[in-house]
A protein has these predicted regions:
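Short Lys/Arg-enriched alpha/beta "domain-start" segment
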Residues: 1-25
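SF2 helicase/translocase NTPase motor core
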Residues: 19-33, 44-48, 55-89, 98-153
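A short, exposed loop/beta-hairpin motif centered on an aromatic-Gly-Thr core
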Residues: 37-40
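The Walker A (P-loop) glycine that initiates the GxxxxGKT/S ATP-binding motif of P-loop NTPases
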Residues: 94
Length: 153
């Protein structure tokens, strides 16, 4: 599998391209240097289909996102972001201090930039929301706005 960032596509050399083209309408088979190659749009939803078929398809965030803020993700954060941007539903039950906040914000920022999401709702204790989430958004994502809503129930 070859990632083609300029074309926003994945190139696959397959024995049975119909396996992919039957599930991904935009997938096209063409010949390159005498070899049939299947070109698939590199988007979160097509990545999920390829993974469900058993391919080790990378998330498009790795080739198309400029990591916001002064940090680049650690390996575990990179894996978390990969999963969050491809799977429509995901729980992150990692331990404290493993970078869940930044991973979530990077995922949201990427999905927002490609038009997949418009808003996010973060539900957590008020103390965590103000200190952790607020500071991370302010420091690493100056392009994002946030509001804190709280109540007695």
């Amino acid at each position: 599998m070859l990632v083609l960032p300029q074309q926003k596509a994945l190139a696959l050399k397959l024995r049975n391209p119909e396996k992919v083209t039957s599930l991904i309408e935009e997938a096209r088979v063409f010949e390159w240097k005498g070899v049939p190659v299947t070109l698939v749009p590199h988007r979160p939803e097509t990545t999920l289909i390829l993974r469900n078929l058993g391919f080790d398809a990378p998330s498009p965030i790795h080739s198309r996102y400029q990591w916001s803020g002064r940090y680049t993700p650690f390996h575990a954060q990179s894996q978390t972001v990969d999963i969050k941007t491809v799977h429509p539903r995901m729980y992150n039950c990692s331990d404290m201090g493993t970078g869940k906040t930044l991973s979530t914000l990077w995922s949201y920022d990427y999905l927002r930039s490609i038009g997949r999401v418009k808003r996010a709702l973060i539900v957590c204790p008020l103390s965590t929301l103000s200190v952790t989430w607020g500071e991370h958004i302010f420091e690493h994502f100056p392009n994002l706005n946030y509001a804190v809503l709280h109540g007695s129930r």
